[in-house]
From Swiss-Prot:
EC number of the protein: 3.5.1.2
Enzyme class: hydrolase
Reaction(s) catalysed (UniProt annotation): L-glutamine + H2O = L-glutamate + NH4(+)
Gene behind the chain: glsA
UniProt keyword annotation of Hydrolase present: yes
Taxonomic superkingdom: Bacteria
GO MF term set: glutaminase activity
InterPro entries tied to this protein: Beta-lactam/transpept-like (IPR012338), Glutaminase (IPR015868)
Disulfide feature: none
Annotated keywords: Hydrolase
Protein name from the UniProt record: Glutaminase
Annotated source species: Bacteroides fragilis (strain YCH46)
Family, as annotated: Belongs to the glutaminase family.
Length: 321
């Protein structure tokens, strides 16, 4: 089944999504991290990155917010590049836990591996795997360069957010040392946790995340810079991880209602990948009870449903002028 969509259609639907959703008052800012609690709750932006490099934007698409857990996708890509898909499967895994993203119980139940790079335990383990082992500065450079390559522009560390995160990350400290107990962290636990905390504190925009999603959708080639960031054979690995655990224990509901693999973060960002078609991101700080942006979810669902797109419907989608 073939489906053609014009760029003007996408522009119209993105604008409609913004107008439909911007007045929604549901959810509240994350209050357990002081920096996030104080961000303007009315901020809202959407960006779609087409595979020709064109971005379609509306609202606060260029506001820098904390990337938070969306960064897990980026570092998963980095270790897939450095180690290969099979080694990552063996050292971390790719399975959903069915439990909250910061669960310690998940480690106790399945201590043979941290289960997936897209939950906290697996993400801390992923940071420990980044090479060169034992060199915090060079590991950090690799993490930032990878995000820059994916987004097409450099993220900026939000120092206030980093300090807030570091002062309140008691649960993650427990996770790091529990991983050490089970030999599932591959560098110094404190270093690995600090790298994870710092990467979550990087400031990005909805437009940047849409380009990163577009890079995944485009087989590893950044649509804007045209740089081959990773091998195309990794796209299905990355997309499957996002589909199964991008919304944590609610990933099934998300996939059923939206039809697009997407990753969420408590900073208010959501990044979605439609392979071969486009990358999309939306940002708004108020979150639902599971830590997912209310407006971003509604906006992306609106775009997908209005355009009649779904990763599972088997359609070959062509975007035309």
């Amino acid at each position: 089944m073939d489906k053609k969509i014009s760029i003007s259609q996408i522009k119209e639907v993105v604008q409609q999504a913004y107008e439909q959703v911007k007045g929604n008052t549901g959810g509240k800012n994350a209050d357990y991290i002081p920096y996030l609690a104080n961000i303007d709750k009315n901020l809202f932006g959407i960006s779609v990155c087409l595979l020709n490099g064109q971005t379609i934007t509306v609202g606060d698409f260029d506001y820098r917010f904390g990337i938070e857990s969306v960064s897990k996708v980026h570092t998963a890509i980095l270790i897939l590049r450095q180690y290969g898909a099979q080694k990552v499967l063996e050292m971390i895994g790719a399975d959903a836990t069915g439990l909250p993203f910061n669960s310690i119980i998940a480690i106790l139940l399945e201590n043979d591996h941290p289960s997936t790079p897209l939950v906290n335990a697996g993400a801390i383990s992923a940071c420990s795997m980044v090479t060169p082992i034992g060199n915090s500065d060079k590991k950090w450079d690799a993490i930032v360069q990878n995000i820059t390559d994916l987004c097409g522009s450099a993220p900026q560390l939000i120092e206030e957010l980093y300090k807030s995160e570091t002062a309140t990350n008691f649960n993650n400290r427990s996770i790091a040392w529990l991983l050490k107990n089970y030999n599932r962290i591959y560098d110094d636990p404190n270093m690995s946790l600090d790298l994870y905390t710092r990467q979550c504190s990087l400031g990005v925009t909805a437009q940047m995340l849409s380009v990163a999603a577009g890079t995944v959708a485009n087989g590893g080639v950044n649509p804007v810079t045209k740089k081959q960031v990773f091998d195309s054979e990794l796209t299905p690995k990355i997309t499957s991880m996002i589909a199964t655990v991008g919304f944590y224990e609610h990933s099934g509901d998300w996939m059923y209602t939206s039809g697009i693999p997407a990753k969420t973060g408590v900073g208010g960002g959501v990044m979605g990948v439609l392979p071969g078609v486009f990358g999309v991101s939306a940002f708004a700080p108020p979150l639902d009870g599971s830590g997912n942006s209310v407006k971003a979810q509604l906006a992306i669902k609106y775009i997908m449903n209005k355009l009649g797109l779904n990763v599972f419907n088997g359609a070959r989608v062509t975007i035309v002028d």
